[in-house]
A protein has these predicted regions:
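Inward-facing hydrophobic residues that define packing positions of alpha-helical scaffold repeats
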Residues: 158, 165, 182, 189, ...
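Charged, amphipathic alpha-helical scaffolding segments
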Residues: 66-83, 177-191, 195
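Polybasic, proline/glycine-rich intrinsically disordered low-complexity segments
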Residues: 54-58, 77, 204, 208-216
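N-terminal pre-first-transmembrane soluble regions of secretory-pathway and organelle membrane proteins
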Residues: 1-168
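Short, charged/polar, low-complexity loop and linker segments
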Residues: 166-180
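Extended, non-membrane alpha-helical segments enriched in charged/polar residues
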Residues: 40, 163, 167-170, 187, ...
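Long, hydrophobic, amphipathic alpha-helical segments used as structural scaffolds
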Residues: 104-107, 111, 169, 193-208
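Membrane-proximal, non-transmembrane alpha-helical segments
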Residues: 88, 190, 215-216
Length: 216
């Protein structure tokens, strides 16, 4: 399997995941954990990490998806290895990951007292997933880390973008809907990146209110 085939397989795996999606809530713990794994995995694919490493990550996620489908008594779909016709979406995924990298870099510079202050301030938004650093090099640490909480909306925006991209994969000849879903996916990725930057500014000015005049 090469990088292009791996990306095709990624979307097919996400299609399997989506088949369970409409049965449950996004707030279900395992659901969020899988979205986080998919975020991690696609970032690694775009960076073209070592292919053997990527296949190992792929197999772990595929097993999780299989177990997840069994948990909700959903049969796997018989999907062929279909790819998107073009790659306009990649630029906007890269913007999303760049925003996430800034977010993680910002959080890493905070001490424990500052983290707690932000946690209290953002208590209604702090039910997301956790990230370790801008490289995301270790899936095990990526899953276990509980320092960097991604806002719930960012998970939702990523997931909604993937739903539209998966529709394009399953309906490659429907040109009218293809472009419409591509535009929606891009808009969700832009919204997700904006949400991350907005949180950075919110937390920064909470911790350093004297600098708030910089916003004007």
């Amino acid at each position: 399997m090469n990088y292009q085939q791996l990306e095709c397989d990624y979307f097919n795996l996400y299609n399997q995941f989506i088949s369970v999606d409409f049965q449950i809530s996004l707030f279900e713990k395992n659901h969020k954990s899988l979205i986080k794994d998919f975020i991690f995995f696609y970032h690694q694919i775009l960076k073209q990490k070592d292919l053997n490493f990527l296949l190992g990550v792929r197999n772990k996620i595929a097993l999780k998806v299989h177990n997840y489908m069994q948990e909700y008594s959903t049969s796997p779909k018989d999907l062929s290895l279909i790819c998107l016709r073009e790659h306009k979406h990649i630029e906007f995924f890269q913007r999303f990951y760049k925003a996430l990298a800034y977010f993680v870099a910002f959080r890493k510079k905070l001490d424990e007292e500052q983290k707690i202050k932000n946690l209290i301030s953002n208590i209604n938004d702090c039910f997301g997933c956790h990230f370790i650093n801008s490289d995301f090099n270790n899936l095990q640490n990526f899953q276990k880390n509980d320092f960097f909480t991604l806002p719930e909306k960012c998970l939702q925006y990523f997931h909604l973008a993937m739903i539209h991209l998966c529709f394009m994969v399953l309906n490659p000849l429907n040109f009218k809907d293809y472009n419409r879903h591509l535009d929606k996916a891009i808009n969700y990725l832009i919204d997700g990146a904006f949400e991350i930057y907005e949180l950075i500014f919110k937390e920064y000015f909470l911790l350093f209110p004297k600098d708030e005049e910089l916003k004007d």
